């Protein structure tokens, strides 16, 4: 049989274990919450690495001629002298002079093996391979 003093000591140890466990659980929850918020980003506060771009929205549809139309919204954090562009069919930061002068093919927008041609009105470019042609028109 245990003495009242031993019972009080056991209760105290048990209580301190529960308090410690609750504290560890709270710390873990805060760390997990902070890391998931960092991955998701805060609306309006999300920072991306300088010199990179990320797609924030994609839109896709077909017109009446069964031609697929795609558009995307991109968020970039470019270095000074750079602007949002396209390299190897992915959003990227490119030299501003390429965009200003509309030398679209100088940013290498097409995939490996595709030919790049600037559209006649300089509004974008086309990438072609065999009988497949992808046309990109720049909008701001």
From Swiss-Prot:
One GO molecular-function annotation for this sequence?
receptor ligand activity
Q: What is this protein called?
A: Chemokine-like protein TAFA-4
Main location as per UniProt: secreted
Locations listed in the record:
Secreted
Q: Which GO terms describe its cellular component?
A: extracellular space
Query: What organism, scientifically named, is this protein from?
Result: Macaca fascicularis
- PANTHER family per record: CHEMOKINE-LIKE PROTEIN TAFA FAMILY MEMBER (PTHR31770), CHEMOKINE-LIKE PROTEIN TAFA-4 (PTHR31770:SF7)
Q: What does this protein do?
A: Modulates injury-induced and chemical pain hypersensitivity. Ligand of FPR1, can chemoattract macrophages, promote phagocytosis and increase ROS release.
Q: Which InterPro entries match?
A: Chemokine-like_TAFA, TAFA_chemokine-like
Pfam family, any one: TAFA
Cysteine pairs bridged by disulfides in the record: none
The organism's superkingdom is given as Eukaryota
> Where does this protein have coiled-coil stretches?
none
Which N-terminal residues, if any, form the signal peptide?
1-35
Single biological process term from Gene Ontology: superoxide anion generation
Q: What's this protein's family per the entry?
A: Belongs to the TAFA family.
Arranged from A to Z, the UniProt key words for this protein are:
Secreted, Signal
């Amino acid at each position: 049989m245990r003495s009242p003093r031993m019972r009080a000591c056991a209760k105290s140890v048990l209580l301190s274990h529960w308090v410690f466990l609750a504290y560890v659980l709270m710390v873990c929850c805060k760390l997990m919450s902070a890391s998931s918020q960092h991955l998701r980003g805060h609306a309006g506060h999300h920072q991306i690495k300088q010199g990179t771009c990320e797609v924030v929205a994609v839109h896709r549809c077909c017109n009446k001629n069964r031609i697929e139309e795609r558009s995307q919204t991109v968020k970039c954090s470019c270095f000074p002298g750079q602007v949002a562009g396209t390299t190897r069919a992915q959003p990227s930061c490119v030299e501003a002079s390429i965009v200003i002068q509309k030398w679209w093919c100088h940013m290498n927008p097409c995939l490996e093996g595709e030919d790049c041609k600037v559209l006649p009105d300089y509004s974008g470019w086309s990438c072609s391979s065999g009988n497949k042609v992808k046309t990109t028109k720049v909008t701001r």
